[in-house]
Amino acid sequence: MSTEPDPIAAVAEGLGRTGYIASRPIALALHLAQHLGKPILVEGPAGVGKTELSRAIAAWQGLPLHRLQCHEGLDESRALYEWKYGKQLLYTQILKDRIAPLLGDAPGLAPALKALDGFSDLFFSEQFLEPRPLLAALREPRGCVLLIDEIDKSDEAFEAFLLELLADHAVTIPELGTIRAIVPPLVLLTSNGMRELGDALKRRCLHLFIGLPSPAMEARIVAARLPGIPPLLLRQIVLFIAGLRALDLKKLPSISETIDWARALVLLHTEHLSPDLVRETLNLLLKHEADISAAQPALAPLAFQAKRDAETGMPLPA
C-alpha cells in the first residue's frame, strides 16, 4: 500500500483554503493541466462554479488572474492588443517639425514616402502597444491564470484565432512578429453550451464538466460560504433544492442560487423551512415566472419532506 501523499487531494485541499469546494474530478483536471501544460475546457450549466474556479486557482497559487469575457463579435483587437492611437497622434504632432524638412527636401512623392519609412516602425513599436487580456497574460513574468469566459458566445473565427495561443502559448502581431509567453499561463475556458465548440479547440484542451452537485457536496459548498449557518437548516436547504431540481423546470436552480437563498434565510433568522417562507423567497431560486408557477403545487410537499428527512440525521445523498 502506497504511502505517497495523494496529489489530487492536495489540490482539493488547496482550493478549499480559498473557500472553493472541489470534487475529485475538478482537482484531477487541475493537477493534470498544471503538469501537462494543457488548457482546461470547463463546461456545465450556468452558476455551478466554472468562473469561480479560476478565481480560486489564482488565489491559491498567488497568481494574477486575467479574464477575457467573450461575446458575439469579439475579435483579436479587443482580446489581444490595440494601438494607443491618442499617443501616436501626440507623437505625430511633436515630430511634425522634424518630418517637414525631410518631405520638403524630397524631389518627389516616392522619395518622400521612402523618407517616412523610418518613422513608421516607431509608431508601431512596443511603446505604442496596449495589451488586452490575452497578451497581458503572456507577458506576466511569474505566470498567471487566464480565464476565457463563455467561449461559446464568440464565433468560430475567434475560436480559430485562439488555437495558436492554446497550442504554443504564443500569439502573432503583424507589426511585431510572434510573442511567446514568459511563463505559460494556466488557461481555463468556460462554456455554457450555447453552441457546439469546434473539434480543433477541444483537442487542445482537457475536458471538465461541472454539473449540479449532490446534496452532500452542496452542503459542503454552502457551509464554506456561510460558516455560521445552522446545520439543521443547511440540511433542509440542500434536500429541498434536490427535490426542486427533480421538477420539470426551464431553468433549474444552480449552486449560486442555493447560496443566495441560504444567505437570505440566515438573514431572516430562519430555523426551519415552511411552505409560506419558501413561496415568499422562491424568486431567489427560480428566475422564470413559468417555473415559479409550475413549482407551486410541489412546494409544500417538498418543504415538509426536506424538514422530515433533515431531522432524521441520516447522511445526505452523495
Short names for language-model regions:
Residues M1-A318:
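C-terminal regulatory/interaction module of P-loop NTP-utilizing enzymes
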